[in-house]
Curated annotation (Swiss-Prot):
The species this protein was found in: Emericella nidulans (strain FGSC A4 / ATCC 38163 / CBS 112.46 / NRRL 194 / M139)
Annotated family: Belongs to the short-chain dehydrogenases/reductases (SDR) family.
Molecular functions (GO terms): oxidoreductase activity
InterPro entries in UniProt: NAD(P)-bd_dom_sf, SDR_fam
Annotated protein name in UniProt: Short chain dehydrogenase atnD
EC id: 1.1.1.-
Top-tier EC class: oxidoreductase
Null allele phenotype: Abolishes the production of aspercryptin.
Induction data: Expression is positively regulated by the aspercryptin cluser-specific transcription factor atnN.
Residues at which NADP(+) binds: L41, K66, D90, N116, Y204, K208
Signal peptide feature range: none
Summary of the function given for this chain in its UniProt record: Short chain dehydrogenase; part of the gene cluster that mediates the biosynthesis of aspercryptins, linear lipopeptides built from six amino acids including 2 highly unusual and nonproteogenic amino acids, 2-amino-octanoic acid (2aoa) and 2-amino-dodecanol (2adol). The core structure of aspercryptins is as follows: Ser/Ala-Thr-Ile/Val-2aoa-Asn-2adol. The first step of aspercryptin biosynthesis is the generation of the fatty acid precursors, octanoic and dodecanoic acids, by the FAS subunits atnF and atnM.
């Protein structure tokens, strides 16, 4: 029997050195919203969308000043004006999420949502009554997705269904490494807000595993709906040089520095995976997890009946 850790490491190293095609898919006339669009993967994906003829690209960001700087960077590099908009959202604040969704309801259409924003920290903190990583990466992310779905499912004025809308959740290969001990709890989200049970060193990876469970569960429900179809998928950009580790202790960043220098993709290379996932409008990737442009199954070792309980709790 294959050693799962060796298999994971083999895939990881193979993935990091694979060459990803430069995006060439057309997003002509599309309206696209990217959370965390002011930096890293989100910024570079937004830059591609503008270059690929999107009609509107919304950078949903916490800091409007940084968002405006990102907008200027995109306009300078693409020589395209009047496409990028900057909207505010704070995923630590449910009311901010609801406000963004309400604002989006006034859009003429919404074709693509890239749920890219997230945090990685080993520091325990509560936001309201939930641990901060779970609130941002899971609860607020999927609250926003659910709130945006009605707009994405609208028909156009002529009553014709346009190209199938897409929701892309930015995931991580790290979901395979977490023990996710909370999955054994009677109430999973209660366990996730209990500091005594928390292993913050793997909390980010746990949040990414829960994301995958929710992607699959929501995709299944959407496929059974009588409303216009929406493709919901998840994508791993691989190990990338972004600001994700900004809340990681300095010592840890120094120790991982050589690995990042040798193995990590730059943000533009990683963003190509997001653009590829966003272009998949034929339904084939619905509920799927993508890595290096390939579809993969979810981590089988965690795909127990508790996955259903996790989704039901949400």
């Amino acid at each position: 029997m294959a050693n799962p850790e060796r298999s994971y490491l083999s895939r990881f190293f193979s993935s990091q050195f694979s060459k990803l095609p430069y995006p060439s898919q057309s997003f002509k006339d599309a309206v696209i919203l990217v959370t965390g669009g002011n930096t890293g993967l989100g910024l570079e994906a937004a830059r591609h969308f503008v270059r690929l003829q999107a009609a509107t690209v919304i950078l949903a960001v916490r800091d409007l000043k940084k968002g405006e700087q990102a907008k200027l960077s995109i306009e300078e590099s693409t020589k395209v004006q009047g496409v990028v908009e900057v909207w505010q959202v704070d995923l630590e604040d449910v009311r901010s999420v609801q406000s963004l969704a309400a604002k989006a309801s006034s859009l003429p259409r919404l074709d693509v949502v890239v749920a890219n924003a997230g945090i990685s920290t080993n520091k325990w903190a509560l936001v309201g009554d939930m641990e901060r990583t779970i609130q941002v990466n899971v609860l607020s992310t999927f609250l926003l997705i659910l709130a945006l779905l009605p707009k994405m499912q609208e028909q156009d004025i002529e009553g014709q269904i346009r190209a199938r809308p897409r929701v892309v959740v930015v995931s991580s290969e790290g979901h395979e490494t977490t023990a996710f001990a909370e999955r054994k709890a009677a109430r999973i989200f209660d366990a996730l807000r209990d500091q005594r049970q928390a292993n913050m060193d793997e909390r980010y990876d746990t949040s990414k595993l829960i994301q995958l469970y929710l992607v699959r569960a929501l995709a299944e429900r959407l496929s059974r709906s009588d409303k216009p179809p929406v493709t919901l998928n998840a994508v791993s950009p691989g190990l990338c040089k972004t600001g994700l580790l900004r809340e990681t202790p300095l010592v840890a960043r120094l120790l991982t520095g050589p690995v990042m220098a040798i193995l990590a993709r730059n943000a533009e290379e990683g963003s190509r995976t997001l653009v590829h996932a966003a272009a998949a409008n034929d339904g084939e990737t619905n509920g799927k997890y993508l890595r290096d442009y390939l579809q993969r199954l979810y981590a089988a070792k965690k795909a127990t009946p508790r996955r259903r309980d996790c989704c039901r709790s949400f």
